[in-house]
Structure formats: C-alpha cells, structure tokens
C-alpha cells in the first residue's frame, strides 16, 4: 500500500508487515508516473539500500530503505476498487452482474484493502467495472463478521478473452466507525457469483482482519 508524495517521499507498507522507503532517485527512474497517478497498491521489485541487511527475512514493522529495480520487470500497479454501501433494490449491481470465472479462496486483508486473485472473462477493447458492496444485513456485530459481495460488469455479452489478476478492494472504514464490535479483529467474508449455473452470491473465501487495518496507513 503506497503513501506519501514526491515532495515528502513515499512509504510502501508491505502485506508482510515490513515498511519500505524507496530512494527518490529510484522512484523517478522506475515509477516516474507515481506522483501524477492514483496508484494505491503495487508490486515492486527492490534491493535493500544497506548491504549489511538481509533482504530474505524482512521483519514486521521495521523500516527499510530500498532501491527500486526496473531490471526485474516486476513493478506494476494492482487494480484497486471501491467498496460501496448498497441501499437501493432497484440498483443495477445485481441485474447487471456477471459471473466471476474463478476466484482464489485465499483472500487477505491488510493496510486498508482486502485482496484476492480473480479470473474473469471479458471482451477485448470493452470496458468493464468491478466493485464490492455491502448492506446493513451484511454487518453482523454479534458474531463480529462483515460480508463483502463482489460483482463485475464486463459490458459484453460475448466475452472473447480471459484474464487473471490480484485485485484490491478498499475496506469500508465506516463499518467500524458506526458499529461496536466486541473484539479488535473481525471475520471478513467475500462472496461472489462464480461458475455459470449459480443464481445467487456464493461464499468464496474468508479471513481475519484487524479493525486497525480498515484504515490505510498514515504517512
């Protein structure tokens, strides 16, 4: 998860707990468009700036100075989407919903986002949208559980291609602000329509998420 800017410098909060601070020179070389883009999540390849530190076993909550490396061909943005509150029965979220071809059940949530590996069918050169939503019924305070429901619209009746990507959905901070959960972590369940014969949302994965991780890290 990316925080900061070109003036104050960037800080990358890894999903493994370590905190990475890239040199300004390597950001300009490898990710020159970062200052003008809305990238919030990314894969990055890097070396540690200090040769005395071991890059194989980075410690959680420890800050490391890094140098981004373009030669590894591994720097790219992760698609990120909003989570919205679904309030109107006449909304098109369900009526235009397309089935997700496949979704990895090993989802994880940290640093303000829930993440999953998703495979979808689409038609090339046709725009598609993706999002997660929740309703009041999806918030179960008594059992410390939140359901998020995944949908996407390929805007195509005849998909011609298939794609796979890690995607990130912004966790809804208002859920923890307006609900009194009894623990400091809750169960997060991700539902989606998968396959071709399902007619309703189906649970595809779940994970534990700390309430503090509903907010993005503060720079």
Description of each model-found segment:
Residues 4:
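A short catalytic or substrate-binding loop motif that flags glycine-/basic-rich loops and adjacent residues
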Residues 7-219:
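First exposed extracellular module after export/assembly in secreted or surface-exposed proteins
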């Amino acid at each position: 998860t990316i925080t900061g800017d070109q003036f104050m410098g960037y800080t990358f909060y890894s999903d493994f707990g370590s905190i990475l601070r890239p040199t300004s020179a390597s950001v300009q070389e490898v990710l020159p468009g970062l200052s003008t883009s809305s990238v919030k999540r990314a894969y990055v390849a890097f070396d540690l700036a200090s040769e005395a530190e071991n890059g194989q076993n980075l410690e959680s909550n420890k800050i490391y100075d890094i140098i981004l490396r373009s030669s590894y061909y591994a720097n790219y943005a992760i698609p990120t989407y909003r989570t919205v509150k679904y309030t109107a029965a006449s909304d098109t979220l369900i009526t235009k919903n397309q089935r997700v071809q496949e979704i990895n059940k090993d989802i994880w949530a940290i640093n303000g986002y829930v993440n999953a590996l998703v495979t979808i069918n689409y038609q090339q050169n046709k725009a598609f949208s993706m999002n997660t939503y929740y309703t009041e019924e999806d918030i179960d305070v008594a059992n410390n559980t939140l359901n998020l429901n995944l949908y996407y619209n390929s805007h195509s009746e005849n998909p011609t291609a298939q794609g796979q990507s890690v995607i990130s959905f912004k966790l809804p901070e208002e859920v923890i602000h307006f609900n009194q959960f009894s623990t400091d972590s809750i169960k997060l369940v991700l539902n989606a329509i998968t396959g071709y014969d399902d007619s309703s949302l189906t649970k595809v994965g779940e994970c534990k998420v700390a309430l503090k991780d509903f907010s993005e890290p503060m720079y």
